[in-house]
Curated annotation (Swiss-Prot):
PROSITE patterns: UBIA (PS00943). It comes from Paracidovorax citrulli (strain AAC00-1) (Acidovorax citrulli). It is an enzyme of class 2 (transferase). One of its GO terms (cellular component) is plasma membrane. This is Protoheme IX farnesyltransferase. It is found in: Cell inner membrane. Belongs to the UbiA prenyltransferase family. Protoheme IX farnesyltransferase subfamily. InterPro entries: Protohaem_IX_farnesylTrfase (IPR006369), UbiA_prenyltransferase (IPR000537), UbiA_prenylTrfase_CS (IPR030470), UbiA_sf (IPR044878). Its EC number is 2.5.1.141. One of its GO terms (molecular function) is protoheme IX farnesyltransferase activity.
Length: 302
């Protein structure tokens, strides 16, 4: 082997790894695992034991694998759509860097490995709920809903709201009202989050042919929906306190964060600009992350 070929071999392996890793949509999956982790922690009274921390780590790994599998399958199905959108044209499937067979095999391998981890080392309920979430996102949302209805985000948001339920089930072996409240919060958060993105990426979505709300119903109608959903979300975010899951620490954080989200949505409704829509979208990510972090702090402080 020549020196040149020897030096390029590691680069080729690294490049191929990066391509497969990109299929898993790492930043999205990180938020999914974080929300699942919050569900795990809240399910355990007091500080978890060493054994429970290990159990959480294994559960997070299994959920990460299946979530990555769903993301990869989404990239496979939407590769031609992704190629027409500036936001997603860089994905390996859209650029033709990975074949359909490679992507499908990678998705299947991750799903199988994650399901096996959850079934063997966590519990059967978590495995089945996680697999159902995979089907909900990869098949029902990606294949059925997204290309057919502007309400795709609303209906399909159920699969994206599942992580706290998965986390809770992984620690308790059942599903109670508490994780369903967390499910409701993410379910209500999803439409204004994605519609804010769709507003300033509307031309991308128009080129893609996807029936996103700004494309089918226009900018003004979508802005109103963002505003209305943030009001409903505000009420939903109070539920952990009302139900007794949290104390005033979480309540104070929820009020501040939801007021901020509503303020962004109101400004967006009154005086639209792409820059403001982008800020609203970014704040929605901060909102959910800090909201769940506040739940975590509240759980340990009081």
């Amino acid at each position: 082997m020549s020196a040149a070929s020897a030096s390029t071999a590691p680069q080729a392996v690294s490049s191929r790894f990066s391509q497969f890793y990109a299929l898993t949509k790492p930043r999205v999956v990180q938020l999914i695992v974080f929300c699942a982790f919050i569900g795990m922690v809240l399910a355990v009274p007091g500080l978890p034991s060493g054994e429970q921390w290990l159990h959480m780590a294994i559960a997070c790994f299994g959920i990460w694998l299946v979530a990555g599998a769903a993301a990869a399958f989404n990239c496979l199905v939407e590769q031609h759509i992704d190629a027409r959108m500036n936001r997603t044209a860089w994905r390996p499937t859209a650029k033709g860097e990975l074949s359909n067979a490679q992507t499908l095999a990678f998705s299947a391998l991750l799903c199988l490995a994650g399901s096996l981890v959850l079934f063997v080392w966590v519990n059967a309920l978590t495995m089945w709920l996680t697999f159902a979430t995979f089907v909900g996102y990869a098949v029902i949302y990606t294949v059925v809903l997204k290309p057919r209805t502007p309400q795709n985000i609303v209906i399909g948001g159920a699969s994206g709201a599942m992580p706290p339920v998965l986390g809770w089930a992984s620690m308790t072996g059942d599903v109670g009202p508490e994780p369903l409240i967390l499910f409701l919060i993410i379910f209500l958060w999803t439409p204004p989050h994605f519609w804010a993105l769709a507003l300033y990426r509307v031309e991308d979505y128009r080129k893609s042919g996807l029936p996103m709300l700004p494309v089918t119903h226009g900018n003004e109608f979508t802005r109103l929906q963002v505003l209305l959903y943030t009001f409903i979300l505000f009420a939903g975010c109070l539920m952990p306190f009302v139900y007794g899951m949290s104390s005033w620490i979480y309540l104070a954080a929820a009020v501040v964060l939801c007021t901020g989200f509503c303020a962004y949505a109101f400004r967006l409704w009154r005086n639209y600009s792409d820059a403001l829509a982008r800020k609203t979208f970014r704040f929605s990510l901060i909102h959910l992350s800090l909201l769940f972090a506040a739940l975590l702090v509240d759980h340990y402080v009081l």
